[in-house]
Amino acid sequence: VADLFDNIVAWLLDRALSDESIESTVSELCSRLVEGGVPLARVSVGRTVLHPVIGLMDMAWDRETGKVETNALTRDIVRGMTEFNAPFGTMSRGETDRIFADLTDPADVARYPLFAELAEQGITAYFAAGRTYGHRQELFDTYGKSFRGGSVSFATKRFSGFSKTDLEGLERLIPPFCVCLRIADDRFVATGLMG
């Protein structure tokens, strides 16, 4: 019997081949998870882009608004990020492929400035993971020097944090979600360059 996460994996793989925007995919992914009982408060997505001007794209979904906000960082800005002390920065440098934090634990909160901000907002647990697309490549001199890929983080305000089942399921979503990201990135570059 397929569970919530099996169904979402299948949906993500179908979605990767559709013409839907990555923003609508993120929005619907979050809705499906919340409707399935996963206590999401916030989801953040970051990815490098092989584009002549844009270096990084990020998106953030917030449960209170239900909206997905998208931002693009130019390559010049990315090159200036010499000390990017954040979970996505740690993963992009290849120091780890996943990060979990109990944001009710002061030791975990102290790991990154972002964790202190999230804890102030009532976030109790944070999980992030990502994937590299193909071989590591020299893209930037500083930030994620040899990283081309995508990362996603999930955060909750539930008092007890994420359950073991939540975390195992969210981890299963990372590869198919990163397939969606890569296809969206390729589409973004092709549209920008070819019109």
Write out the residue ranges for each language-model feature.
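Regulatory and interdomain segments flanking nucleotide-handling catalytic cores
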Residues: 38-41, 52, 108-112, 184
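Short amphipathic alpha-helical segments
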Residues: 6-14, 19-34, 111-116, 167
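Signal-transducing coiled-coil/dimerization helices and immediately adjacent hinge/linker segments
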Residues: 183-195
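Allosteric cytosolic regulatory segments
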Residues: 151, 171-182
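Helix-loop-beta substructure at the N-terminus of cytosolic sensory domains
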Residues: 18-67
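Short, glycine/charge-rich beta-strand/loop segments that flank catalytic centers
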Residues: 44-51, 104-108, 130-135
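Regulatory sensory and allosteric helical modules in signal-transduction proteins
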Residues: 65-129
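Regulatory loop-to-helix N-cap segments in sensory/regulatory domains
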Residues: 130-171
